[in-house]
Amino acid sequence: MSGVSRRTFIKTGAAAAAFAMAQDSSRDNHTPVQPLTAKGGGIDVHHHFRPPIPGAVGDPKWTPQMSLEAMDKFNIGAALLSLTMQREQFYAGTPEARALIRTCNDFGAKCVQANPKRLGLLAGLPFADVDGSLKEIEYAYDTLKCDGIGIYSSTGDKWPGDPFFDPIMQELNRRKAPVLIHAAVPNCCNRGFPPGISTGELDFDETRCAQSLLVNGVLTKYPDIKFIIFHGGGVLPVMAGRIKDRYPNDRKQWIPNGVWAEFRKLYYEIAHGSWRQNLLALKEFADPSRVLFGTDFTPEAIETTLRELPNAPYTLAELQAIERDNAEKLFPRFKL
């Protein structure tokens, strides 16, 4: 290297990297978090409640009032409540799992009934149990008046696009259901990772789920389901090109307009995925009208998502739509 020793270059580069990391850490820890700016407040499509059941996940002190106070603090006008990480209990395929889901949905519906202008319900399903899921969809929509459905990205050795689940998809399509897909570490890749390592598997499994919907024709056969992929699409925005190039030749009937057109039917919420580099990839991949606001509260602090939004690569009009307007189209009862 001309004029600079290799050792000096490495030391200088390391120092610069350390400084950049320190600056980033300082910003993360100390930058004031601003409320959303959307008129009427944002709509949070990824917001968890903690049901009164054994092993419930989330803040043990959670109440609807806790959510409402946090929402008021950050100008969030409405939140769609869904279940969080208890897939093994809910997807056991047993009568007990059906009863557990029913208890959770009844509790979530009571929270909504007490705060109908602020809260909505994405009802859970005993998804591994097809007949139980069909009964729960009927109950959740016709009795509880839910706003949509929440499912997990995989169960056992199956992902939601598997033909085994077609009867469920047919009914969700008939209902024109918004469906939030919450990731879980799949059985195939749950290797007892040390703390912090399994986090990536959530995003990888969300991407496997999207592939499953694609190659099994769910996105084509059931176009009225509004699937919502969490955390900005997982790793899908950066993997989609490889997925496109490796699409099976014997399944071309499911991509009449190509792979990109199918993936662009999906919606993408940005809870804990609002870093600029993530959103740059998402903006190239998905139309801004398909991007939704979410927080992953209570497992994740609302500040985690809001802190990064000032750096988002969207115009003010696009951010307004992401914060509220896009979700109003999926959940019209919250329309101003």
Predicted region positions:
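Mid-to-C-terminal alpha-helical segments outside catalytic/metal-binding sites
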Residues: 2-41, 45, 54-78, 106-114, ...
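Short, glycine/acidic-enriched loop or turn micro-motifs at the edges of active sites
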Residues: 47-49, 185, 299
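Hydrophobic faces of well-ordered beta-strands that scaffold small-molecule active sites
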Residues: 43-47, 79-81, 121-123, 149-151, ...
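Aromatic-anchored helix/helix-loop segment that forms the rim or "lid"
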Residues: 251-280
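Acidic-and-aromatic substrate-binding clefts and catalytic sites of carbohydrate-active enzymes
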Residues: 56-62, 89, 127-133, 156-163, ...
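Short acidic/histidine-rich active-site segments
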Residues: 182-183, 227-238, 269-271, 285-304
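Active-site gating/metal-coordination segments in enzymes
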Residues: 77, 83-209, 216
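Aromatic-lined glycan-binding groove of carbohydrate-active enzymes
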Residues: 223-259
